Amino acid sequence: MEKYLPACLDSVTDELVSDRLEVIVVNDGSTDGSLDIIRRYEQKRPDLIKVIDKANGHYGSCVNAGLGIATGKYFKILDADDWFDTSALVEFLQKLETCDTDLVITLRVDEIFDKDKKVDEIKHSFCSVFKDHVYRTDEFYIRTHSYEAEFGMNGMAYKTSLLKEMNFRLLEGINYTDTLYCFLPYSRVKDFIVYDLYLYHYRMGREGQSVDTESQKKNLMQIVHMV
């Protein structure tokens, strides 16, 4: 992850956004140079970055560790090989100042790489009927039968208080826990809003990635367990 990490951290430490963020970086027992990179960013911005250095426990343990010390109004996850669009993040943070829904949904761009060369991008939209309007969750169930609607873990920002009040924790020591993150807290959500912002840039094509076909074959029973 070390070669992707600077782009990830740069996207959340830009001067345009850093005064309105709490950045929690979890080092999950990395054996490359990731921790050294994290410490350099921490030294530059000790007011912004909180570092958790722990033994490897897989994805769920990282989310649990970060949520455990989170104090911000909303909780959003960014993987080490992905990044936020700075201009979209600026607008997103401005909107969150007045937003009060339990869940905020933004859009995603899949960045397709062949080795380290970008070869394509796919923008995942959300039907315009949903955008910039507060909906109750029961309205969402009804409307998604008639309109295209797509979102996942990387498009979701839950209220931190909602996650903490339900004592939310992901399973640890197992992959593909994003399914639980999407649906378990959502069962407590009363309302949500969709912002037309392509905030999350999701890197695809990295060898060993969890969505890689070979990785999914290898971890098939973990996927079945999550479902």
Put a short name on every predicted segment:
Residues 3-6, 32-41, 53, 87:
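Acidic helix N-cap motif at the loop->helix transition within catalytic regions
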Residues 10-20:
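Short, acidic, metal-binding catalytic loop of nucleotide-sugar glycosyltransferases
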Residues 11, 27-36, 55-58:
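A conserved acidic beta->alpha catalytic loop
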Residues 20-29, 50-55, 80:
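Short beta-strand/loop segment that forms part of the nucleotide-sugar
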Residues 22, 48-50, 102, 191:
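Structural signature of beta-strand start/N-cap positions in the alpha/beta core
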Residues 54-70:
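Glycine-rich, basic loop-to-helix element that forms the pyrophosphate-binding segment
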Residues 59, 80-193, 204-217:
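Donor-binding/catalytic cores of nucleotide-activated saccharide
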Residues 75:
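Short aromatic/hydrophobic "clamp" motif used to bind/position activated sugar donors
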